[in-house]
């Protein structure tokens, strides 16, 4: 086992234990923190926005009490009412309970819970970090409890009713539960700091645990800093409301990614509320926690030790000379419960410990914020404030923060100077527009990126002849001229939005209302009293939350998966999935398939593809090659594909070859796990180089796989045998050994084969130690990792009864979930899948023959999405279903039908909480079960093994046949779909095409004088298994119909394309006449002249590719040329062929019984390219060129497999001759076709003779060279040549590695 991994595991365990212990310390008695806190409070601790009567006052709002009218009720029931509790001091609140008014119809059905330390600047408690409201009561007497996770630490609580019984009014009785909370605080004013010096023996240099809570008045500041003499440091800094943890080992000016930790957590931390921080460092492991968000970091390189001074500063950098020279700002705010490695730092300050130095002013009570924020909750929110009309100028200022890039900030009408002022947020910029009658609007634009969630200050003023706006202290560059008139306000300022037009307002908001927070609102240099606004004594408002800023960061945590970029507005977030390889609202779903098998069954050809083996899982997609044969092979390459020769090694000076793959080991493992079979060829040559030490059995050479374990079995063997191929087969050179190399011969031998034990693949390393003796040498070459099949893709189960189902563990897809599968059925309906929780659930079902439905509930009430099809789903064909649910939306996709999408409710429940087993093919009630097949069921990218579970489940069978019904359409050009136990294949035996889908065109270049002859009488005798002479069955070989298809390209005329003959001098010839026209000549009666079908529209010998299709049904012939010329003709010479003899492509050797035009074309033959020749069920060209069962075909002359496709503008014949495929076969006929040859053939024959002589000379030269090299090797065997090429030539000549000639191979020397 790797010692580094052991150490890492130990460090993680220690870090986990320290986390648990510290959490217990920090929580105090949280496990016993459920005491009622309200029942014993005095009446003065209760307050409210209003009360219906003195007997409905807030003091009567205690749970289960009947005092007064039996609870609190406000004067008016609206959403601006509240009930407030003062707990007397900060307490930890762990749960709340509500009840309606006793004996009444008054109860609250939903409410908000707010909390505060001072009774000002309230913060809303949110469930699941996004739920705004709590569900309340359904009657007056029942009690509804809510456990608060996390708990609240606060003095004041405020209940704000949102909805209530529509037949009654607001009525509440409440109780809160919790316990006392230990709070030790210190307030730093932005100029002060603490310096803590400690005993060097009390600390470990590799371990730090720091915990604290803070509440800040500013968005920037140093919370803690510890540095060392060499530049090592730990710094926790607040920047723009986010916390940055910086840990550096070494000179900060020479930082590198291996030594610098820069972790960022939190957002909007400058909200003047408490936030908790926990930092844990143990060696290279770092945990950083802010509130409920945690990040873990594992440092690389030498990071275990930090050289730090024995002092740490809080609130600033107390010794700047020792720190990094970076600009910094002191912390302004309050620290609470500050512990450094278990030491109460604030307690030491209170005790005036000499270990603590306080610089500046510090106090032990927290100063409270003076500003009062307000929240514009919706686009309909607005605040209307009065302004004096007697002022000679207009001025207004405020601060705002928002995520929106557009919205109305301020509107005001002008007096005297008619017109209006409009202050907008537009595209993140501030735009001030002055409207005056008869004039074009005047604009001032200021600021940029103002929708970033930060506080921004705005000040505008309008005087007699000047208009200006200041944003964050920057004055606008230009101001429009107002004129000499005095400027007065119209008496009203509209902030954030406009009332409805029915109120008579002239306010306008072209970009919609503002959603965000404002504070420090000032009009004409007078601060607005928002308490008076809240009490209704000043101005007017709608849909505001006063004394609270309700902004939240919807991108924390980032719900965009797989590296998607998160952006947000006030009410939602958006994910940019560009260049991630994923799609969907949260970048959850991969755009790539999970295997080559999946690509193949979409009809794709061989090529490079991205695959994503775990689908929506964490692994990224990677590029590989898919070789689409009858089976889809996945080819994964590495960097060591060259032959490597090794010399001069021994046990202390071993050669180690390391292989790096184009994918990570995790990605490779996922691909291997999906595959049915994987293999990797390891070619190993040896000469006096042993694999095993025969004395003690220890290995002399070995390889390592992804398990990082030493493997001593070799290609063709398995781990249980620890042998080579020859050892398994019993044919090793020396029978006493299990490998050829162990014979230790002074000549080259090999132990080569395929490694196929999936759990050990791929090979990552090979080690060789036994090439140190004289004449000792080894060579190896590792092939790519090859995998075939996709087990989950075909993993299926057949459900035979409605009461049967498969059950699996609970599906965990709390925030993001996807389910995909194939189904086929003839049933009318049935449930595919169901998983239940207490109230939450998911269900996917066939609702009707044309409807698939996805139902779910995550706490916001049940939703249904249905996809309707114009055709039936119960057609016994495979249909693909994909369901996804995330924080943004839910979607249902079936086949290629339009998807159904349901947006998630804003600020609704987001956690899918399930606890039952997952039922597949049925339900827990055993009703509405599915009848049919389910295949390739995957949940969040993880496949469920349906077949394994089906083998032990009554009413369910593993597997499902009948794939051709759905995938048979992939078999093209007459290929037949054939079933396999897992999948299907295309039988191309009767097609002129080849390949996995019968789509690979079989083409050939015909040289001058060449031909392919298919003999029907031999085929007949083979098929009938008869030995009679052909004449005995001439009468049986009759054709009343045939179908002929082929393509050709040539520049020669005349030419013979195809000729079919019979023993009775009947024939069909397809020729290009001397004038370039295409002629089809049928002679079905030897006593009649042939019927000629001629196409002389243009020359067909034009070097272009032409397609011919001929169908004959007795005397009727239909001809199609190039898919645009069609003709139908009736023959006069007969209706059938009698005693069919042969079919010829190219030149005919005998043509005495044909007409003159055919004879002329036959003498010239065909020079060019023929492709995809099909004669009924016979493919003569394919039979000649492709390996397969014996066929009655004869090839003469130069016929080579080629391609008929050529770039436009090139000479067709010359293009064809550039192909260098070896001549292919059938039965080669070496007879010289000279009987009726024309004079031009002599040149061809001469050329062929010259080529043969040249080949013989080359073979002789090679033989002489090999003989010379053998002699040279024997003379210099004791001396190792330094020349790589000559050394490899020796190895190749001895091993006859002809296929390796010309490869860029390597040689390794020690």
Swiss-Prot record:
<feature type="domain" description="EGF-like 2">
    <location>
        <begin position="960"/>
        <end position="999"/>
    </location>
</feature>
<feature type="domain" description="Laminin G-like 3">
    <location>
        <begin position="795"/>
        <end position="960"/>
    </location>
</feature>
<dbReference type="InterPro" id="IPR008979">
    <property type="entry name" value="Galactose-bd-like_sf"/>
</dbReference>
<feature type="glycosylation site" description="N-linked (GlcNAc...) asparagine">
    <location>
        <position position="1025"/>
    </location>
</feature>
<comment type="subunit">
    <text>Interacts with TIAM1.</text>
</comment>
<dbReference type="InterPro" id="IPR000742">
    <property type="entry name" value="EGF-like_dom"/>
</dbReference>
<feature type="disulfide bond">
    <location>
        <begin position="334"/>
        <end position="366"/>
    </location>
</feature>
<comment type="similarity">
    <text>Belongs to the neurexin family.</text>
</comment>
<feature type="signal peptide">
    <location>
        <begin position="1"/>
        <end position="27"/>
    </location>
</feature>
<keyword id="KW-1015">Disulfide bond</keyword>
<dbReference type="GO" id="GO:2000821">
    <property type="term" value="P:regulation of grooming behavior"/>
</dbReference>
<feature type="glycosylation site" description="N-linked (GlcNAc...) asparagine">
    <location>
        <position position="287"/>
    </location>
</feature>
<feature type="domain" description="Fibrinogen C-terminal">
    <location>
        <begin position="589"/>
        <end position="794"/>
    </location>
</feature>
<dbReference type="InterPro" id="IPR036056">
    <property type="entry name" value="Fibrinogen-like_C"/>
</dbReference>
<dbReference type="GO" id="GO:0050807">
    <property type="term" value="P:regulation of synapse organization"/>
</dbReference>
<dbReference type="InterPro" id="IPR000421">
    <property type="entry name" value="FA58C"/>
</dbReference>
<dbReference type="InterPro" id="IPR013320">
    <property type="entry name" value="ConA-like_dom_sf"/>
</dbReference>
<feature type="transmembrane region" description="Helical">
    <location>
        <begin position="1244"/>
        <end position="1264"/>
    </location>
</feature>
<feature type="disulfide bond">
    <location>
        <begin position="33"/>
        <end position="179"/>
    </location>
</feature>
<dbReference type="GO" id="GO:0098982">
    <property type="term" value="C:GABA-ergic synapse"/>
</dbReference>
<dbReference type="GO" id="GO:0030425">
    <property type="term" value="C:dendrite"/>
</dbReference>
<feature type="disulfide bond">
    <location>
        <begin position="933"/>
        <end position="960"/>
    </location>
</feature>
<feature type="disulfide bond">
    <location>
        <begin position="555"/>
        <end position="566"/>
    </location>
</feature>
<keyword id="KW-1133">Transmembrane helix</keyword>
<dbReference type="GO" id="GO:0032225">
    <property type="term" value="P:regulation of synaptic transmission, dopaminergic"/>
</dbReference>
<feature type="glycosylation site" description="N-linked (GlcNAc...) asparagine">
    <location>
        <position position="540"/>
    </location>
</feature>
<feature type="domain" description="EGF-like 1">
    <location>
        <begin position="551"/>
        <end position="588"/>
    </location>
</feature>
<keyword id="KW-0812">Transmembrane</keyword>
<keyword id="KW-0677">Repeat</keyword>
<dbReference type="GO" id="GO:0030182">
    <property type="term" value="P:neuron differentiation"/>
</dbReference>
<dbReference type="InterPro" id="IPR002181">
    <property type="entry name" value="Fibrinogen_a/b/g_C_dom"/>
</dbReference>
<feature type="topological domain" description="Cytoplasmic">
    <location>
        <begin position="1265"/>
        <end position="1310"/>
    </location>
</feature>
<feature type="glycosylation site" description="N-linked (GlcNAc...) asparagine">
    <location>
        <position position="1075"/>
    </location>
</feature>
<feature type="glycosylation site" description="N-linked (GlcNAc...) asparagine">
    <location>
        <position position="576"/>
    </location>
</feature>
<dbReference type="GO" id="GO:0007155">
    <property type="term" value="P:cell adhesion"/>
</dbReference>
<feature type="disulfide bond">
    <location>
        <begin position="577"/>
        <end position="587"/>
    </location>
</feature>
<feature type="domain" description="F5/8 type C">
    <location>
        <begin position="33"/>
        <end position="179"/>
    </location>
</feature>
<dbReference type="GO" id="GO:0050804">
    <property type="term" value="P:modulation of chemical synaptic transmission"/>
</dbReference>
<dbReference type="GO" id="GO:0005886">
    <property type="term" value="C:plasma membrane"/>
</dbReference>
<feature type="glycosylation site" description="N-linked (GlcNAc...) asparagine">
    <location>
        <position position="750"/>
    </location>
</feature>
<dbReference type="GO" id="GO:0032228">
    <property type="term" value="P:regulation of synaptic transmission, GABAergic"/>
</dbReference>
<feature type="domain" description="Laminin G-like 4">
    <location>
        <begin position="1048"/>
        <end position="1204"/>
    </location>
</feature>
């Amino acid at each position: 086992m790797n010692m580094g991994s052991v150490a890492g595991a130990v460090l993680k365990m220690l870090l986990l234990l320290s986390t648990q212990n510290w959490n217990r310390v920090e929580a105090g008695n949280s496990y016993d923190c459920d005491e009622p806190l309200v029942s014993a409070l005095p009446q003065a601790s209760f307050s409210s926005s209003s009360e219906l009567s003195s007997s409905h006052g807030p003091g009567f709002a205690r749970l289960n009490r009947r005092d007064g009218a039996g609870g609190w009720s406000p004067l008016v029931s609206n959403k601006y009412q509240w009930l407030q509790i003062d707990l007397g001091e900060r307490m930890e609140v762990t749960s709340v309970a509500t009840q309606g008014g006793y004996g009444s119809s008054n109860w609250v059905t939903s409410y908000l819970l707010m909390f505060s330390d001072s009774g000002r600047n309230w913060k809303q408690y949110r469930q699941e970090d996004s739920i705004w409201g709590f569900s309340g009561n359904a009657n007056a007497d029942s009690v509804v409890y809510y456990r608060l996770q996390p708990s609240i630490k606060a003095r004041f609580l405020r209940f704000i009713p949102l909805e209530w019984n529509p037949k009654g009014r607001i009525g509440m009785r409440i109780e809160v539960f919790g316990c006392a909370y230990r709070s030790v605080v210190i307030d730093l004013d932005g100029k002060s700091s603490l310096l803590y010096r400690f005993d060097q023996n009390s600390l470990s240099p590799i371990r730090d645990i720091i915990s604290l809570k803070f509440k800040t008045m500013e968005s920037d500041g140093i919370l803690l800093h510890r540095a060392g003499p060499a530049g090592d440091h730990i710094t926790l800094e607040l920047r723009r409301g986010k916390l940055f943890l910086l840990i550096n080992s070494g000179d900060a000016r020479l930082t590198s990614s291996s030594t610098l930790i820069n972790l960022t957590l939190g957002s909007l931390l400058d909200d003047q509320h408490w936030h908790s921080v926990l930092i844990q460092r143990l060696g290279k492991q770092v945990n950083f926690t802010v509130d409920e968000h945690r990040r873990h970091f594992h440092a690389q390189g030498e990071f275990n030790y930090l050289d730090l001074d024995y002092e740490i500063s809080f609130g600033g950098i107390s010794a700047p000379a020792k720190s990094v020279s970076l600009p910094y700002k002191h912390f302004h705010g309050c620290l609470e419960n500050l512990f450094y490695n278990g030491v109460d730092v604030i307690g030491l300050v209170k005790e005036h410990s000499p270990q603590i130095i306080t610089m500046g002013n510090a106090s032990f009570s927290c100063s409270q914020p003076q500003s009062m924020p307000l929240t514009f909750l919706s686009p309909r929110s607005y605040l209307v404030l009065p302004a004096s009309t007697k002022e000679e100028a207009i001025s207004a200022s405020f601060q705002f923060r928002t995520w929106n890039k557009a919205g109305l900030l301020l509107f005001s009408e002008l007096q005297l100077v008619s017109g209006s002022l409009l202050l907008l947020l537009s595209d993140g910029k501030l735009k001030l527009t002055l409207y005056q009658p008869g004039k074009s609007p005047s604009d001032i634009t200021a600021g940029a990126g103002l929708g970033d969630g930060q506080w921004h200050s705005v000040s505008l003023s309008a005087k007699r002849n000047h208009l200006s706006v200041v944003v964050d202290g920057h004055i606008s560059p230009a101001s429009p001229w107002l004129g000499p008139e005095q400027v007065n306000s119209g008496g009203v300022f509209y902030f954030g939005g406009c009332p409805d037009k029915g109120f008579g307002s002239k306010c306008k908001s072209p970009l919609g209302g503002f959603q965000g927070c404002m504070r420090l609102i000032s009009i004409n240099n007078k601060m607005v009293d928002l308490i008076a606004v809240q009490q209704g004594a000043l101005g007017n408002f709608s849909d505001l939350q006063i004394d609270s800023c309700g902004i939240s960061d919807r991108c924390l945590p980032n719900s965009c998966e797989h590296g998607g970029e998160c952006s947000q507005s006030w009410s939602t977030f958006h994910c940019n999935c560009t260049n991630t390889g994923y799609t969907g609202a949260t970048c959850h779903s991969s755009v790539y398939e999970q295997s080559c098998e999946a690509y193949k069954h979409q009809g794709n050809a061989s090529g490079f593809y991205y695959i994503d083996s775990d689908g929506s899982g964490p692994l990224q997609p990677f590029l590989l090659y898919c070789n689409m044969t009858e089976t889809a092979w996945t080819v994964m390459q590495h960097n060591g594909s060259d032959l490597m020769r090794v010399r001069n090694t021994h046990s202390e000076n071993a050669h180690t070859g390391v292989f790096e793959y184009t994918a990570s080991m995790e990605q490779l493992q996922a691909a291997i796990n999906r595959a049915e079979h994987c293999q990797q060829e390891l070619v190993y040559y040896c000469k006096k180089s042993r694999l095993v030490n025969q004395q003690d059995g220890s290995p002399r050479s070995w390889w390592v796989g992804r398990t990082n374990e030493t493997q001593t079995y070799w290609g063709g063997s398995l781990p249980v045998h620890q042998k080579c191929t020859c050892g398994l087969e019993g044919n090793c050179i020396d029978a006493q050994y299990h490998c050829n190399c162990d014979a230790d011969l002074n000549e080259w031998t090999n132990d080569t084969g395929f490694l196929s034990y999936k759990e050990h693949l791929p090979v990552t390393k090979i080690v060789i130690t036994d090439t140190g003796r004289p004449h000792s040498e080894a060579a190896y070459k590792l092939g790519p990792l090859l995998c075939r099949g996709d087990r989950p893709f075909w993993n299926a189960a057949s459900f035979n009864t409605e009461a049967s189902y498969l059950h699996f563990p609970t599906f965990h897809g709390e925030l993001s979930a996807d389910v995909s599968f194939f189904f086929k059925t003839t049933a009318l309906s049935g449930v595919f899948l169901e998983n239940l929780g207490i109230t939450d659930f998911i269900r996917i079902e066939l609702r009707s023959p044309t409807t698939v439905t996805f139902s779910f509930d995550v706490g916001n009430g049940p939703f249904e999405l249905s996809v309707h099809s114009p055709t039936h789903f119960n057609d016994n064909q495979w249909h693909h279903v994909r369901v996804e649910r995330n924080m943004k939306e839910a979607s249902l996709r079936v086949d290629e039908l339009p998807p159904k999408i349901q947006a998630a409710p804003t600020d609704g429940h987001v956690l899918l909480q399930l606890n039952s087993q997952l039922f597949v093919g049925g339900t827990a009630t055993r009703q509405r079960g599915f009848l049919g097949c389910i295949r390739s069921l995957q949940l969040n990218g993880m496949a469920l093994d349906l077949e394994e579970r089906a083998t032990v489940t009554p009413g369910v069978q593993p597997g499902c046949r009948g794939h051709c019904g759905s995938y048979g359409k992939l078999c093209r050009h007459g290929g037949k779909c054939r079933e396999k136990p897992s999948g299907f294949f295309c039988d191309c035996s009767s097609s002129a095409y080849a390949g996995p889908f019968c789509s690979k065109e079989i083409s050939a270049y015909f040289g001058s004088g060449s031909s392919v002859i298919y003999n029907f009488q031999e085929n007949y005798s083979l098929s009938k298994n008869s030995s009679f002479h052909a004449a005995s069955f001439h009468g049986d070989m009759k054709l009343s119909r045939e179908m002929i298809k082929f393509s050709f390209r040539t520049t020669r005329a005349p030419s013979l394309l195809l000729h079919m003959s019979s023993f009775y001098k009947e024939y069909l010839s397809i020729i290009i006449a001397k004038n370039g026209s295409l002629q089809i000549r049928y002679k079905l009666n030897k006593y009649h002249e042939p019927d000629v079908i001629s196409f002389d529209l243009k020359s067909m010998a034009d070097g272009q590719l032409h397609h011919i299709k001929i169908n004959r049904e007795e005397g009727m012939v239909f001809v199609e040329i190039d898919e645009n010329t069609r003709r139908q003709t009736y023959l006069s010479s007969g209706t059938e062929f009698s005693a069919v003899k042969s079919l010829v492509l190219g030149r005919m050797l005998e043509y005495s019984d044909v007409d003159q035009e055919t004879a002329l074309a036959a003498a010239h033959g065909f020079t060019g390219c023929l492709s995809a020749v099909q004669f009924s069920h016979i493919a003569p060209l394919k039979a000649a060129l492709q390996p397969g069962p014996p066929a009655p075909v004869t090839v003469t002359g130069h016929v080579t497999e080629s391609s008929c496709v050529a770039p436009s503008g090139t000479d067709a014949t010359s293009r064809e001759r550039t192909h260098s495929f070896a001549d292919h076969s059938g039965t080669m006929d070496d007879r010289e076709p000279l009987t009726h040859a024309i004079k031009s053939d002599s040149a061809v024959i001469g050329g062929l003779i010259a080529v043969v002589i040249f080949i013989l000379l080359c073979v002789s030269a090679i033989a002489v060279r090999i003989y010379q090299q053998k002699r040279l090797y024997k003379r210099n065997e004791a001396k190792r040549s330094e020349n790589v090429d000559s050394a490899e030539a020796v190895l190749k000549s001895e091993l006859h590695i002809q296929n390796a000639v010309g490869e860029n191979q390597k040689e390794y020397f020690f």
